[in-house]
Every structure is written in C-alpha cells, then in structure tokens.
C-alpha cells in the first residue's frame, strides 16, 4: 500500500515536471554495475542494474525552504546465478521522502562564492519482496526502516562529506560514511572525480553485515571498510550526462575479514573492484 501511494506520487511529479520545468524536477540515474556494494559489504558479486529516481519540488518561488520530494531505488540482477534466492527484476525496491537545502556562502560575501553547505535528510523504507530466502519471508524482515542525514561542504578545492544511516526496524544499528571528493574539469563537458571514503558502524551493524564475531564476543564500533573510486563523466546536454567509473572496496577490520573469509557464500568478498557505467537524466 505504501509503495503504491509512493509510486503514484512519483508519477504525478514526473508529469508535472514534464509540463513545468520550474519548480518541479525529476532526476533519473540508471546504471550497470559489476557488483552491488552497500553499507560496508558486497551484497552481490555479479552484474546488476540499479536505478535511482528523485522527483521533487523546489520551494525557491515560494520561499527559501530548499527542495522536498520522493525518491525510489530499484535493484535487478542480470544473471541466472542465485535465482533460487530471489527473482531477477526488482528483487529490491527502496523508497522514501527527502528534504534538501543548500546554504550558499556566497550570500555573505563574494569571497565565498563557490562555497556552500548541502544538507540532505531522508526517511527510507527498504523492501526485499523479490527474495525467496527464508530470512526474507519473515514478516519482520520484509522491510527495513531507517533515517539518513548527509552533509557536504561544497567548494572548488576538496569537498568533505558524511552520511549517517540509522536503522530503526526490525534492527537497531548505526552506519557512518565519511570522505572527500574533488571534481576536475577536463573540458567544458568532460570531468574526472576521484573520491575516497571510509565506512564505520556500530556493534549491531557489524553483526548484521558480517555475522557473529569469530571466537565469540562482540565487535567494537568503529572502522569497517575503505573505498576509493574514480569517475569520468561526459555532459552530453543539459538533460543527460554519461559516466563510467571504477570502485575499489576493502574490508578494513581484521575480525570482519576473518569472518567473511570463512563464509562459503560466493558473494562473501573481503576486497573487490567494481565497474560502473550509467547515465544521469535531469528534467
């Protein structure tokens, strides 16, 4: 029921955006990835199709309140492997609402032009109804409810950022991602973006992602994994940008690495290089 309401609102926003470019907008980002990385873990080590859609309303015409809207994230597998575990298309569908606000430091003084603080607050529901695994059939595991808070200090030099995700139901956990990125303009339409980030988590989050600690006891909250990525983007037009990237993932916690190494599952990877190609549409 909640998903149907969300998708209906998303479609309505898309139609509005098609007729009135301002203040409504829709961003759609389909991408092909050689693996699926999420919250310090390789969830799938096979090709996946992922699509992120954000439909929103910019309040700038009625007041300086930022942007509000809906978002949707879908995951589909592109191979037959693990077909007994979940269906191919839309085996995961996440959705939620968001509020985004950009504080432009240039308002204070021209010296700060190009600097700003972007804040993104989201309420999410992650659903896994395409799974046939017994753990996913239990009602308490049918979906995950969480909050997200993300901020970045945008500037022409090196942009630091962080993301906090708090799991509420059915499990209580805390995940923190923090890093830096830099966009290098190669030409008017071509850019290169290196990005580095660390992933940290609470004790409960360690157990949810990796399983019980080897030898018993509990994990300590702290660093989980390190990531380095490089993206090359080509802006074809104001409405479309093509991009390709490579992402190196590695678990940084010794006990977690030992636990994953002992896991016989084919997607239990301690380190992995992930390739991505995609397109970003803005309407």
Question: Predicted segments — roles?
Answer:
Residues 12, 19-21, 44, 61, ...:
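Sterically constrained small-residue positions within well-ordered secondary structures
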Residues 1, 5, 10, 119, ...:
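Compositionally biased regions
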Residues 52, 57-64, 101-107, 153, ...:
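Outer-membrane beta-barrel transmembrane domain signature
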Residues 21, 28-35, 72-77, 154-163, ...:
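Flexible, solvent-exposed coil segments and beta strand-coil junctions
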Residues 18-84, 274, 280-282:
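Short glycine/proline- and aromatic-enriched beta-strand/turn motifs that initiate or cap beta-hairpins
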Residues 1-25:
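Cleavable N-terminal export/targeting peptides
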């Amino acid at each position: 029921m909640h998903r149907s309401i969300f998708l209906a609102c998303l479609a309505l926003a898309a139609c509005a955006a098609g007729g009135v470019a301002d203040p409504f907008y829709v961003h759609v980002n389909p991408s092909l990835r050689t693996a699926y990385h999420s919250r310090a873990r390789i969830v799938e080590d096979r090709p996946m199709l992922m699509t992120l859609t954000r439909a929103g309303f910019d309040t700038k015409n009625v007041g300086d309140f930022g942007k509000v809207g809906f978002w949707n994230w879908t995951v589909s597998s592109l191979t037959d492997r693990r077909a007994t575990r979940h269906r191919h298309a839309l085996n995961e569908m996440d959705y939620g609402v968001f509020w985004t606000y950009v504080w432009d430091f240039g308002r204070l003084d021209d010296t700060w032009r190009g600097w700003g603080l972007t804040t993104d607050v989201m309420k999410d529901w992650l659903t896994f109804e395409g799974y046939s695994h017994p753990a996913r059939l239990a009602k308490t595991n049918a979906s995950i409810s969480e909050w997200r808070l993300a901020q970045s200090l945008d500037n022409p030099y090196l942009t630091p950022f962080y993301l906090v995700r708090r799991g509420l139901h059915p499990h209580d956990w805390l995940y923190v991602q923090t890093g830096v990125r830099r966009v290098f303009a190669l030409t008017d339409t071509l850019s290169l973006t290196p990005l580095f980030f660390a992933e940290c988590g609470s004790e409960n989050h360690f157990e949810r992602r990796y399983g019980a600690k080897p030898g018993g006891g509990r994990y300590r909250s702290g660093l989980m994994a390190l990531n380095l990525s490089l993206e090359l983007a080509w802006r074809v037009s104001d409405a479309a940008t093509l991009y390709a990237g490579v992402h190196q993932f590695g678990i940084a916690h010794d006990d977690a690495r030992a636990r994953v190494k002992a896991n016989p599952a084919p997607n239990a990877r301690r380190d992995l290089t992930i390739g991505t190609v995609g397109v970003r549409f803005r309407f």
